[in-house]
């Protein structure tokens, strides 16, 4: 049999058979993923298979996802306007509350204007290709989120990947490429979703100004939590108004759904005409926009929420470190990773914690690099402190039993 014959035979196999083989390979490598149905989110807990357990796996950092005031705001607009936008916003799906939310988000982030998208993924795969193309170069942090990586690839720009948070190497790349491309775009996260650390955005701005590069910061995990006003990593690093493209999400600290990009009026007007993932999709349901507007208001007028997040993060990190476990990120960072390494062992720890009444994230490749599978623990303002202490004790106990 020739190689061509073998290839043809493989291609002609029934889909179910070929895909089942791939699933079995994922299973053997400890990389097969499944979903679980959770409901009745309340005070940092959820119902799972009829049992109420502590949820340390969500991104509901401020505890707003189940706030009744947010639900009432959505309900009022739901009754008045129905369930959906009905069309893309450029056709007949633009609602006054979309405009109100965009103005509020722009003000919150210290930008001129903002544009809503259905998700953060859709922001990144739409905005980046609208700004750069094959004539340009992108500098991307090696630990950037998959949506940023995909947006960079879709742009067809040359992509230079620099070591995580390494401004010296980024500067060397910018120097080496000086004058070779039409545009240079530096793409980073404000808070890295799997490591919990903050990019040094003040240094980023200095480099960008020196080399004439544009800056793109996805602050999905900083928004609502970091900074004196809770506006995110950009405020935390003291560079409000100095980032060219600011991305944020509604589905994490603000507890609703959707995302946005903010910047100058000119930027937003261009994206309205060029970002394909905005143009060719139905508008956000007005009720969800209403919920987001109320959640944003609460995040601003209830600063106790972000301080509670920081207190709980400091407590959890301190207990884990006292128990001999290394955790990365800032001392009060709300994302607490505990690297285990092997994906199968990681999921075994997750399963045992679940049996004990704690839901934590088990993160494996390709979400994180091979050999760095981990627990991803996230704290919420509404977690009782005694629950944080109980989690830390159980994590340490399970890890001792797994690793000795």
Where do the PLM segments sit?
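PLP-dependent aminotransferase class I/II
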Residues: 247-249, 253-320, 325-328
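Conserved PLP-anchoring active-site segment centered on the Schiff-base-forming lysine
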Residues: 127-146
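Conserved N-terminal alpha-helix of the aminotransferase class I/II PLP-enzyme fold
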Residues: 72, 76-119
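Conserved active-site segment immediately N-terminal to the catalytic lysine
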Residues: 212, 232-250, 269-273
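Active-site phosphate-binding strand-loop segment of PLP-dependent enzymes
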Residues: 160, 164-217
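PLP-dependent enzyme catalytic core of the Aspartate aminotransferase-like
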Residues: 1-2, 68, 72-76, 80, ...
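N-terminal "arm"/small-domain region of PLP-dependent enzymes with the aminotransferase-like
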Residues: 15, 19-83, 213
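Conserved PLP-binding catalytic core of the aspartate aminotransferase-like
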Residues: 307-317, 321-357, 367, 371-372, ...
């Amino acid at each position: 049999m020739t190689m061509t014959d073998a290839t043809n035979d493989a291609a002609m196999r029934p889909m179910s058979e070929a895909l089942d083989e791939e699933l079995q390979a994922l299973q053997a490598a400890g990389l097969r993923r499944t979903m679980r149905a959770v409901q009745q989110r309340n005070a940092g807990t959820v119902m799972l298979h009829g049992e109420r357990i502590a949820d340390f796996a969500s991104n509901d950092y401020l505890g707003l996802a189940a706030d009744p005031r947010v639900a009432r705001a959505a309900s009022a607009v739901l009754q008045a306007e129905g369930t959906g936008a009905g069309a893309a916003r450029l056709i007949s799906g633009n609602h006054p509350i979309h405009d109100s939310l965009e103005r509020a988000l722009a003000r919150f982030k210290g930008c001129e204007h903002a544009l809503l998208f259905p998700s953060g993924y859709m922001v990144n795969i739409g905005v980046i290709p609208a700004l750069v193309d094959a004539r340009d170069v992108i500098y991307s942090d090696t630990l950037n989120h998959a949506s940023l990586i995909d947006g960079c690839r879709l742009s067809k720009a040359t992509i230079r990947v620099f070591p995580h948070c390494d401004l010296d190497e980024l500067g060397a790349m910018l120097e080496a490429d000086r004058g070779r491309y039409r545009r240079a775009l530096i793409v980073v996260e404000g808070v890295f979703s799997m490591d919990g650390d903050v990019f040094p955005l003040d240094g980023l701005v200095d480099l960008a100004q020196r080399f004439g590069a544009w800056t793109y910061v996805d602050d999905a995990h900083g928004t609502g939590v970091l900074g004196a006003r809770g506006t995110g990593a950009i405020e935390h690093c003291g560079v409000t108004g100095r980032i060219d493209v600011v991305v944020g999400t509604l589905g994490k600290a603000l507890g609703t759904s959707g995302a946005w990009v903010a910047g100058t009026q000119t930027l937003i007007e261009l994206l309205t005409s060029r970002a394909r993932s905005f143009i060719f999709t139905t508008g956000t349901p007005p009720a969800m926009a209403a919920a987001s507007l109320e959640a944003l208001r609460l995040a601003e007028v209830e600063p106790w929420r972000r301080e509670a997040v920081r207190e709980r993060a400091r407590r959890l990190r301190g207990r884990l470190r006292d128990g001999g476990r290394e955790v990365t990120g800032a001392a009060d960072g709300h994302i607490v990773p505990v690297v285990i390494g092997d994906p199968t062992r990681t999921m075994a720890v997750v399963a045992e914690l679940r049996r004990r009444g704690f839901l934590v994230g088990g993160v494996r490749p390709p979400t994180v690099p091979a050999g760095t599978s981990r627990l991803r623990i996230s704290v919420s303002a509404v977690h009782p402190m005694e629950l944080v202490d109980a989690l830390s004790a159980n994590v340490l106990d399970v890890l001792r039993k797994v690793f000795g």
